[in-house]
Each structure stands twice: as C-alpha cells, then as structure tokens.
Amino acid sequence: MVLRGEFCATLKKVRFCGILYVTNDSFKCYIKVGEPMGENKTPQELDFERKHEEYLHRIQNLRLIDDNFMTKVFEDKECSEFLLQVILDRDDLTIREVHSQYGLNNIQGRSARLDILAVDEQNKAYNIEIQRNDRGAEVRRARYNSGLMDANITEPGDRYDQLYETYVIFITENDILKAGLPIYHIERIIQETGMLFGDGAHIIYVNSQIKDDTKLGRLMQDFTCTNPDDMNYPVLAQRVRYFKEDTKGVATMCRAFEEVREEALREGERRKAIEAAKRLLLGGKLSYEEIAEAQGLTVEEVKALDTKRSA
C-alpha cells in the first residue's frame, strides 16, 4: 500500500486512524507494527483494525469522480476555482468562498445538500455536483437545484434585478444527454426569436467520458485517476496527494468514512422506527404520543405516517 508522507529516509513511526505503522522513504510504504492479527486482541480491537485497514485501502482507490472524495478535494478554494475556470473557459474567474455539502431548504421544508457551492467575486453562485448514477443527474433535478439556489441566496426585500447569476454544473460519469459531446450548455431561449431569455440561470452538463487532449478532456482524465502522479494538473494532484499520502489528510478521509458509516446506521435505525410506528398505528391501540415515545419519533412524524386514520 503506497502511502507516502513527510518523513526522512530513516525508519519512523506514524499513526493512521489510530493504527501504528512504520515507514521508510526508500520503500515509500507503510508497514503495520505490533501484535499479529487475532493475537491477544478483543473482538472490538479486531473490528477496529479491520475497519480502518479497509478505509486505508478504499482511500487509495478513490477518484475525483467519487462523490465523497470530490467534496473534500474541491472544498479547497484554489481547486474549485481551477475547476470552474476550465469548465467555463474563464481564466479571470476568482472564487471568494466555497462550501461543501451545503444544505438548502425550500418553503415546504424539503432540503437538498449541494456537493459544492461556490461564490465568485462578482457574486455569481456555482453549484457543482458529481453524479455517477444517471438518476441523480436528471434534468429536473438541475431545475430543482437552480430554483433552490434562487430561493436561498436572496434576502427578503431584494429586487429581482439583484438576483445572483447562478450555475448548476453536473459532472457525470456517463453521457446523460447522449449526444456524444464533452459539455452541454443549457439556456432558456425565446422560441419565436431564438434569442436568449437572459434570466441569469445556467445549467451545464460535463460528460466525463470524453478524455481528449483539450483542457477539459485532460481535466476529465484527472477525474478518473487513482494515482496523483498520473494526473495532468498539479493543483489537483497536490490536493489528491494530501488525502492519499499525508498523515493528516488520510486521517481526515478516515473520519469522513466513519461519519458516512454512522449516518447510514442512523438512517437504518430511523427506517426501522418508522416501520414499527406504522405497524403500531395499524393496531390502533396506542396514541400518537405513546408511539412517538416508543420509537423515538416526534408526534408530528407519527401523525404524518397515519395514512389509515387520515384517509
């Protein structure tokens, strides 16, 4: 497993995600030290080691086209700025702020989490989404994200002409629009004249299947690289190398994996609680309050599940 770090050529100890390794720069790898697997260790310790060894292996196989890794890399302002400069073919673009996994809500309370939300010096807002699954990049989702951005980046009392110019950009593993093009720009037009409507809302699809020798094609090559040494653009390679080879970067990715795992467990428990609440509602013996307390839900959530009584 290649996990280089900032070490001298002599043998040194380092911890990755709580596990002790030794490294020698001559070999540029880590070797775990300590007791052999299974010897004098509790089941909890064995599970901990197994889980983190799995994380280390997964980190080495991560690519920019992978959603969780992409958000970590491009929450860096310099990287997101470079990405947008290439996609929009604008060397003059300067990003003022960038946020990853940015939550937005509509007026009904339904939320969406944007992979990357960036704002440039001219107050133009950019939502960048990575999608390996075709369903996640449906055209109406692009419309939905565009509307959410309008609703969330304006203040009450703002004039319509103060609306930010917005870009929703999907970088997709497959050619969603199926025309064999590297990039698609979607704009509203006036059908009778063919002229642009000019409302300031832009949607762009980038097809990562096209890996030619253009700036965009080389960028898409980088999106499918697992090894930073094989990447074309140093600004991206340096950031990828940090998360794959630097002790702090690897630890950050381990924590990110653990957070995803814990969230999945919470979602699983919540689904079980909802199904149990539905069964109790069908039984008709308990009140909303009793069911809510028993399943760890709110009374409002239980009422919303009661399709039988509300029908």
Where are these regions (language model features)?
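Pocket-edge structural micro-motifs
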Residues: F170-E173, N207-S208, K244
